[in-house]
Amino acid sequence: MKLRNTGQMAFRSPFSNLHVRRSSHKPSHPAFVRQNRSMHYYFRDALNIGAFGIIFGLPCLLYAFTFFCNDISGCPAPSLLHPSTLSIDKLEQEVGWPEDGIKALYDTQVTMWVLSYYLLSLLMQVFLPGTEVEGTELACGGRLKYKFNAFLSAVLILSGCAVGTYLYGTEFALWTFLWDNYVQVITANLIICTAIAIFVYLRSFSVPAPGQLNPELRQLAPGGHTGNVLYDFFIGRELNPRIKLPIPFVGETARTIDIKVWCEMRPGLLGWIILDLSNIAHQYRTYGYITDSIVLTTAFQAFYVLDALYMEPALLTTMDVIMDGFGFMLSFGDMVWVPFLYNFQTRYLSVYPSELGLSGILIVLAVTAAGYVIFRGANNQKNRFRTDPNDPRVKHLKYIETKTGSKLLISGWWGCARHINYLGDWIMSWSYCLPTGVAGYAIIESINPASGEMQKQAVQTPESRGWGMIFTYFYMIYFGVLLLHRERRDEEKCKRKYGADWNRYTSLVRSRIIPGIY
């Protein structure tokens, strides 16, 4: 595999092959940019169909997940298991569809609170101390400057959540607000991400043409200015859209917001963990206890997010920042898809509390550890060899030299498969889903013998058992497909770059991701 700097945990972007692994990348040569743009669109034959399908289809899918796996009738809603007798009226009743219809999915007050969260994150970016870093060299010449303090911002916000929970318990206003207005919070984020995507699309037409004065180092993204309006809006025309806030008494770097980097590392990632915590609070409010499964899942996800935030500067060497424009794809993915799809396992467990027990915990930990050993071992091995090939830990590794001067490892982890780190990354993703077990439940109403009041309880029935896995294991399947797509794109890029050397390399390292299988 090509030697790249992939020292941190992978950050997974929702749709494209983004956030899958950290990699250093040479600045794009103009000839390569022209070749890349004319070579193909990312969705090839399905430009408008693919873009339209994602822009309108994925938000609908997210709403469907939220309604079809619920705390009113079950997960999935019982009528979905009997399609021959399915009726819209019955389904609306089972999923809790609001009486006011689709307009009830939006609430102005909720949207204002969500905007307040975005504003808080923005102000923390500006005023909190942080590390200033230069990005990679741009094709238009020069390097952009970035200020990073996402980890500090997250620590302060989570500390505030901890104080609120200490004072008010699980009735802390933030926890009840997020659960009671969950659908409206989704809508608010969807509106915000769409508005940002429209803004950066329209603003991209003011990017200076080659040869014109360009003091802000603005440039269009390769493949993002095809002339197809819908596709360009979706994929992103401008590479690094930025705004300068009119805030006095702070440095220019501090008040300059790189919209793409800010969206990728701030509101959505931290929002994901905040939603997990609100789900834990809901479980305690409902049942009076917290299960090991929801704690374990939240711990895995929190570690993943905090690791990404702590290593925030590593984002500058990813394909996202170097090559991909910022459009609806990343805007929606970062601010809607990631937090509201990725918290689904803990949301499920908050309604159907499942105890893993010691043996279950050990199994999940063992699977996660196996994935981590593969992922971290492969990346560390590559980084050490790239930094110092004479390091005693890697000097025994075999490699081939290419005409470009790069060295491709053919032994050790990278002799097992050309993208062995993807296998470890995918196995680690299982840890989010396995704690939900064989998912599925129905909401059963019964009389509380002590109080005489009607109560609802989530019970796993033979009919519902297993069907909930469509929702709780969707992430694992989706991420696997994402990695396969990324692997194919990597293979094409490496074949173009290395030519005959890549053919020689693949003849020596035959497996792509899973040794001996694929």
From Swiss-Prot:
NADP(+) binds at residues 382, 386, 409, 414, 421-422, 490, 494-498, 505. Gene3D superfamilies: 1.20.120.1630. Its EC number is 1.3.1.-. One of its GO terms (biological process) is ergosterol biosynthetic process. Glycans are attached at residue 36. Signal peptide: none annotated. This is Delta(14)-sterol reductase erg24B. It comes from Aspergillus fumigatus (strain ATCC MYA-4609 / CBS 101355 / FGSC A1100 / Af293) (Neosartorya fumigata). The lineage of its organism: Eukaryota, Fungi, Dikarya, Ascomycota, Pezizomycotina. The gene is erg24B.
